[in-house]
């Protein structure tokens, strides 16, 4: 039976029966947890240490003193359902049993911390292969020079787990794991291991070897690899400064300092990790495309175009051209072209029956029209009384009357407030 497709219940049964192997890749889609079992007098320090260092020690649940099961593991037993335990006495390792029932006491408190094995199935679902799963070994872990924030009697350096990731998929790994903040989340570092206090990956805390495949380079990260963002398709065309990448993740064995989650874009071009290491190639800004004819034109540009078009048309003849804000100017005709005869200014006659000339009449002598003698065609028509009906007397009233207009009401009179006082 494929062990990578086991459900949590079946996996706990296999461990209880004596199966010893890392839980990496098992129970996909379910959260995995590390157990920290301490006496009651140290439980407060542990529960204070975890919130001060939330990235390496994310708390998933706590069991009261003497409890061996809970809501997070229905039907399970924390004394037998783990592949292997490490027993410490006075800070010294004394045993690695598969069953801690002989060591169990009623004053022991169990704290469950999130494990980075939880998001490994998501990484594999997006095509990011993990070396320790392919080789069937545990994830490698390293001790760094960074210190965790102490709490009571608990203190120590940051311990990270390392996962080799191809350089072209580092951004994908960062994005995927950042969606799991309860199980370490985004990497704590990506790139040169010297930033964590070691020139090479030599300060190991586990004896299980895990080699890096070709075309990968060591890159330290807090909790593994992530998924590709949308802008990575632009960055991947640039040459990579290094051939491969590895991500390191903190393990709950020792605490870590706080570090912001994930990588981010700084300046809109280069992907820079919060620790300050430039881990991805930069991309030079591209020139802005020219404005096409379909783009909106500003009012200033539109007036400039109209003015140039008027000058071009005026070059074919002598027509008055007026620029906004300048007096009228006459452009001389082009070579070999006749000068047209000057046009007479347009005149308008006053509107008969109104007593007020139209707007054109104020520009010249009333009575003249640009279309010839006679009144202006735009003048208001004159209403004349029709002749009397045939057979009627001269003194009889006509059958037609012009429409009478109601007299305008006078404007209301208002008194000045100062006078009314």
Swiss-Prot record:
One of its GO terms (molecular function) is lyase activity. Its EC number is 4.2.1.-. Pfam families: D-Glu_cyclase. The keyword Lyase applies. Keywords: Lyase. Residues 200-298, 312-421 are annotated as: Disordered. InterPro entries: D-Glu_cyclase (IPR009906), Putative_hydro-lyase (IPR038021). Residues 224-237 have a biased composition (Basic residues). Residues 243-260, 370-380 have a biased composition (Low complexity). Belongs to the D-glutamate cyclase family. This is Putative hydro-lyase KRH_21160. It comes from Kocuria rhizophila (strain ATCC 9341 / DSM 348 / NBRC 103217 / DC2201).
């Amino acid at each position: 039976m494929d062990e990578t497709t086991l459900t949590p219940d079946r996996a706990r049964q296999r461990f209880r029966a004596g199966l010893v192997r890392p839980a990496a890749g098992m129970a996909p889609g379910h959260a995995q947890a590390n157990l920290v079992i301490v006496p009651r007098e140290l439980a407060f320090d542990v529960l204070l240490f975890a919130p001060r260092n939330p990235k390496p020690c994310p708390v998933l649940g706590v069991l009261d003193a003497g409890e061996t099961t809970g809501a997070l593991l229905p039907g399970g037993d924390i004394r037998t359902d783990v592949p292997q335990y490490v027993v410490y006495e006075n800070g010294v390792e004394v045993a690695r049993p598969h069953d801690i029932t002989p060591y169990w006491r009623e004053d022991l408190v169990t704290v469950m911390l999130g494990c980075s094995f939880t998001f490994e199935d998501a990484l594999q679902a997006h095509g990011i292969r993990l070396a320790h799963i392919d080789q069937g070994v545990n994830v490698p872990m390293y001790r760094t020079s960074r210190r965790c924030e102490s709490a009571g009697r608990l203190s120590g350096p940051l311990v990270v787990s390392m996962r080799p990731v191809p350089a072209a998929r580092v951004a994908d790994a960062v994005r995927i794991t950042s969606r799991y903040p309860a199980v370490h989340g985004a990497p704590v570092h990506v790139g040169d291991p010297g930033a964590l206090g070691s020139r090479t990956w030599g300060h190991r805390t586990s004896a299980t070897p895990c080699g890096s495949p070709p075309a990968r380079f060591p890159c330290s990260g807090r909790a593994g690899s992530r998924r590709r963002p949308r802008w990575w398709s632009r960055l991947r065309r640039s040459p990579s400064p290094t051939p491969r990448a590895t991500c390191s993740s903190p393990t709950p064995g020792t605490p870590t300092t706080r570090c912001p989650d994930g990588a981010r874009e700084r300046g809109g071009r280069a992907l820079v990790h919060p620790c300050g290491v430039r881990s991805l190639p930069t991309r030079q800004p591209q020139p802005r495309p020219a404005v096409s004819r379909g783009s909106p034109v500003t009012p200033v540009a539109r007036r400039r175009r109209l003015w140039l078009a008027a000058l071009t048309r005026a070059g074919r003849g002598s027509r008055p051209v007026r620029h906004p804000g300048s007096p009228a100017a006459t452009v001389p005709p082009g070579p070999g072209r006749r000068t047209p005869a000057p046009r007479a200014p347009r005149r308008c006659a006053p509107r008969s029956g109104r007593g007020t000339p139209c707007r054109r009449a104020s520009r010249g002598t009333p009575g003249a029209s640009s279309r010839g003698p006679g009144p202006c065609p735009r003048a208001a028509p004159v209403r004349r009384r029709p002749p009397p009906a045939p057979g009627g007397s001269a003194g009889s009233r006509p059958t037609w009357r012009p429409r009478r207009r109601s007299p305008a009401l006078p404007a209301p009179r208002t008194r000045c407030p100062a006078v009314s006082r």
